[in-house]
Amino acid sequence: MNGDRAGGGRPLALITGASSGIGYELARLFAEHGHDLVVNAEDERLEHAARRLRETGVEVRAVRADLRTAEGVDRLVAALTGLTVDVAALNAGVGQGGAFVDTDPRDDQSVIDLNVSSTVRLAKPLLRDMVARGVGRLMFTSSVAATMPGSFQSVYNASKSFVQSFAQALQKEVADTGVTVTSFMPGPTETDFFRRAGMTDTKVGTMDKDDPAQIARQAYDAVMKGRGKLVTGSAKTKAQGVADKVLPDRVKAAVHRRMAEPGSATEDGAAAGDGAATEDGGR
C-alpha cells in the first residue's frame, strides 16, 4: 500500500464481499463515481461481478481469497502492495442461525474468523496507511443486529456488536488525522444471507426485506460525507434503529428470539437446519 494509482490517477476503492448483495452494489457505486476497484470475495461469482463492473470503464482487480483464513487475508493485503487505497469497505461477513447448543463449533469459529478477526487484520494496514497520508475513508458493514442480544444468532450478533464498537472506537482515535471511519447498520436484506445461514424457516427469514441497492446508496453517501454511523435501508429498518436505542435488552432479546427461532415461520415448527454461510453484505 501507499504507492501508485492505477487507471490514470483515479481514486481506488477496496470492497470485500463484493461478489453480490450490498458489497457488489457498493462496488458498482464507487465505479460509477470514477473509482478504480479492488474487489474481493471467496466464491466463484467474483469474476462475473468483476466483468460487470469493468463495463463502467474503470480498472477492476479481482482478488479471490477466503478471509476466514490468515492466508486469505495475507493474499489480499499482498495484492494491495504498491497501491494507494482511498476508500476501503470492509463488508465481507458470514451468518449463522440455530440454537448455540446445536450449532457446529466450526461454524461458530467461522463467524468469528470472518466478521471479527479478518476485520481487525485488514483494518490495521489500511488505517495505518491512511493516517500516514493524512487522508482516507474506512467503512464497516455493521448491522442492526449489533444493537440486540441475538437469540438463535448469538455468535453472529455478538460479532456485529464487536464491529460496531470497533468502528466507533477508531472514529475517535483518528478524529484529527484527516481520515474518516463510517459504520452502517443494515437490517434484513434481500440477499442469500438467510437461505445460506439455514434460516429460511424463521420469521425473519421469510419476511419482506430491504433492497441492497438502497442500502448501498445510503452507505455510499454517508462515507463520502464523512458520517460516523447510520442505520440504512427502509423506513421500517430505520424505525427499528430508533426503537433499539430505548428498548431494554431483555425486550430486544425476546423479540429476536421470536423472529429467529428455527421453525418460527411455520405452524408445525419444522426446522430447516442450522448452518453458517458467507454473507457478502446480507445483514
Model-derived features: positions:
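Substrate-binding pocket helix/loop in short-chain dehydrogenase/reductase
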Residues: 99-101, 107-112
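Conserved glycine-rich Rossmann-like NAD(P)H-binding loop of the short-chain dehydrogenase/reductase
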Residues: 33-48
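Conserved glycine-rich cofactor-binding loop
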Residues: 19-20
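Rossmann-fold cofactor-recognition segment
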Residues: 54-71
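Residue(s) in the substrate-gating loop at a strand-loop-helix junction
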Residues: 143
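Active-site helix of classical SDR
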Residues: 123, 159
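C-terminal helical subdomain
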Residues: 183, 203-240, 274
